[in-house]
From Swiss-Prot:
Entries under Pfam families matching the protein: Com_YlbF
Organism this protein belongs to: Lactobacillus helveticus (strain DPC 4571)
This protein's name: UPF0342 protein lhv_1666
SUPFAM superfamilies with a match to the protein in the record: YheA/YmcA-like
HAMAP family (alphabetical): UPF0342 (MF_01526)
Ranges in a coiled coil: none
Family statement drawn from the similarity comment of this UniProt entry: Belongs to the UPF0342 family.
Superkingdom: Bacteria
Xref: InterPro entries: Com_YlbF (IPR010368), YheA/YmcA-like_dom_sf (IPR023378)
Amino acid sequence: MINIYDSANQLAQDLTKTDQYKAVGDAVKAVQADDESAALFKKMDEIQAKIMQAQQTGKPLSDEDQKAYQELNAQVQKNDKIVALLKSEQGLYDLLGEIQKAYTKPINDLYEGLRN
C-alpha cells in the first residue's frame, strides 16, 4: 500500500529546490535587510489579518481600516523590495496552482462520466 504522505513530503522538499521558491526566499531576505521595507511589510501583514478576520466574521471593515489599507497599499506599490516579493510570491502560487491541477486530475477524471 502506498503512503501518500511520503509523496507529499517529497513534493514539499522538491518545492524548496524550485526557482520560484528560491526567488521568494531571496525577496524575503531583501525585505528583511531593509528596515523601511520590513516595517511596511509588517503593517501590511497586520491590516491583511484584520481584513481576513472581518471577512470571516461577516463584519464590514471599518472606514478607518479601509482608509489605512488604501494608504498602505499606495506605499507598498512604491516599495521596490515589497513589489519584488509580491511578484515572486505570484510566481510560486502559479507553480502551486499547476501542481494542484496535476494531483487533482485523477479526482476530476472520476467525475468525467457524470459531466458528459
